[in-house]
């Protein structure tokens, strides 16, 4: 297995630390006036999502993590697992609830949404939904004219169960585009 020396550390690099795959978020090289140089590294554990800070002496090395990101289409949920398919090889993969985390509220069955799946040794670690999804509003209060004292927005429940703030003119049954990274309403589609 390949390994990376401290002089090869950079943001986005995926390494193994204490048996867990981690992604380097920040790397700072420190050369004190007295003593050996070292790297102060901020890492995110890809399994738990926790961010930790470590220091490594100059010249130390870490093993490369067998982590890869792949684009796959979302197919369906069978109650326990969420199923995805590679668009070219038609290979299917299933992700559990921990790998799905917040992605659950943005994915609709048979939508063929192209998701980014992070695989570690062939098993899904995390699922990132597309940046924008188009979902139908199943429940929202009617927007009454002149009811803008609170900033001009109202909560709306989408067909996947997610709740977003939408403008007053958006009605029940309409399809809206939502940014999955922030959970914000973008525009009305129909």
UniProtKB/Swiss-Prot annotation:
One of its GO terms (biological process) is peptide biosynthetic process. GO terms for molecular function: translation elongation factor activity. Keywords: Cytoplasm, Elongation factor, Hydroxylation, Protein biosynthesis. It is found in: Cytoplasm. It comes from the Bacteria. May be beta-lysylated on the epsilon-amino group of Lys-34 by the combined action of EpmA and EpmB, and then hydroxylated on the C5 position of the same residue by EpmC (if this protein is present). Lysylation is critical for the stimulatory effect of EF-P on peptide-bond formation. The lysylation moiety may extend toward the peptidyltransferase center and stabilize the terminal 3-CCA end of the tRNA. Hydroxylation of the C5 position on Lys-34 may allow additional potential stabilizing hydrogen-bond interactions with the P-tRNA. Pfam families: EFP, EFP_N, Elong-fact-P_C. This is Elongation factor P. The gene is efp.
């Amino acid at each position: 297995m390949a390994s990376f020396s401290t002089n090869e550390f950079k943001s986005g690099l995926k390494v193994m630390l204490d048996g867990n795959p981690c992604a380097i978020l920040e790397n700072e090289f420190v050369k004190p006036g007295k003593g050996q140089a070292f790297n102060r590294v901020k890492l995110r554990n890809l399994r738990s999502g926790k961010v930790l800070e470590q220091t490594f002496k100059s010249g130390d090395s870490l093993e490369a993590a067998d982590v890869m990101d792949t684009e796959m289409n979302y197919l369906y949920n069978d109650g326990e697992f969420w199923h995805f398919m590679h668009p070219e090889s038609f290979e299917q993969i299933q992700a559990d609830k921990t790998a799905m985390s917040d992605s659950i509220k943005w994915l609709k069955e048979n939508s063929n949404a192209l998701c980014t799946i992070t695989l570690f040794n062939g098993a899904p670690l995390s699922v990132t939904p597309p940046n924008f999804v188009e979902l139908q509003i199943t429940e929202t209060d009617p927007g009454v004219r002149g009811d803008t004292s609170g900033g001009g927005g109202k909560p709306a429940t989408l067909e996947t169960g997610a709740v977003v703030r939408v403008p007053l003119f958006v009605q029940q049954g309409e399809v809206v585009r939502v940014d999955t990274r922030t959970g914000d309403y973008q525009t009305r589609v129909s």
